[in-house]
C-alpha cells in the first residue's frame, strides 16, 4: 500500500510525516513525500513588480529572472524534503520525494489519482475562521475531492 504525504514545512506537516511513518512501519506501507510550490508564492510576488516597466509591460529579462526564481524555490523545497528524510528514521521503509509546481490542492489530488495512492496523510494547518470561510483550506478541498481516504493529523497531534 502507498501513502501520499504533502509537506509544507510546518511543524504540523512534520507531525503528519511522523504519523505516516508509524502507519508504514505497522502495515508495511511505502511513503511518497511531496512539496507543492504555488506558482505565484510570496517570494515570487515580492519580485513581480520589479519585472514590470512603468507602463505595466513585462521587462524582457524578467522571463529569465522568473525562471531562476522558480528554480530557487523548487531547490528550497527539495532541500526541505531531503532534510525531513535525513532527520526522521525511514529505515526499512520505501520513501520517495517529489516537488510539484502548481495549486497545492490540485497537485495533491492529481498525484493521488495518477499514482493510485491508498491514502493521503496530511495536516490541517490553522487558518483563521474568516479566511477558511472565504477560501477554504487545502485540506478541506483535498478531503472533499480525494479518490482515496484522507487521514488528517490535527495540528495539536504530537507523536
Which functions belong to the PLM regions below?
Residues 15-18, 103, 137:
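Short, conserved clusters of charged catalytic residues that mark active-site
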Residues 61-72:
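C-terminal alpha-helical "lid/dimerization" subdomain adjacent to the S-adenosyl-L-methionine
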Residues 32, 96, 151:
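Conserved beta-strand positions in the Rossmann-like core of class I SAM-dependent methyltransferases
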Residues 40-41, 48, 105-107, 129:
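Generic structural signal for helix capping and beta-alpha/helix-loop junctions
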Residues 1-63, 89-91:
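Small/aliphatic-rich secondary-structure junction motif
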Residues 71, 75-120, 157-159:
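Structural beta-alpha unit
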Residues 13, 74-77, 135-139:
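Short, conserved glycine- and acidic-residue-centered signature motifs
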Residues 106-159:
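Gly/Ser-rich helix-loop-strand patches that form or flank binding pockets
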Amino acid at each position: 500500500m502507498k501513502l501520499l504525504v504533502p509537506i509544507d514545512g510546518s511543524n504540523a506537516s512534520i507531525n503528519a510525516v511522523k504519523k505516516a511513518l508509524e502507519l508504514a512501519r505497522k502495515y508495511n506501507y511505502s511513503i511518497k513525500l511531496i512539496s507543492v510550490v504555488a506558482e505565484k508564492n510570496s517570494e515570487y510576488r515580492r519580485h513581480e513588480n520589479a519585472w514590470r516597466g512603468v507602463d505595466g509591460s513585462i521587462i524582457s529579462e524578467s522571463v529569465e529572472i522568473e525562471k531562476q526564481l522558480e528554480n530557487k524555490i523548487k531547490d528550497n523545497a527539495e532541500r526541505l524534503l531531503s532534510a525531513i528524510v535525513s532527520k526522521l528514521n525511514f529505515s526499512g521503509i520505501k520513501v520517495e520525494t517529489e516537488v510539484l509546481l502548481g495549486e497545492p490542492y490540485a497537485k495533491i489530488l492529481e498525484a493521488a489519482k495518477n499514482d493510485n495512492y491508498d491514502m493521503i496523510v496530511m495536516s490541517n494547518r490553522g487558518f483563521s475562521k474568516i479566511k477558511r470561510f472565504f477560501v477554504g483550506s487545502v485540506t478541506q478541498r483535498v478531503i472533499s475531492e480525494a479518490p482515496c481516504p484522507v487521514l488528517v493529523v490535527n495540528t495539536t497531534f504530537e507523536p
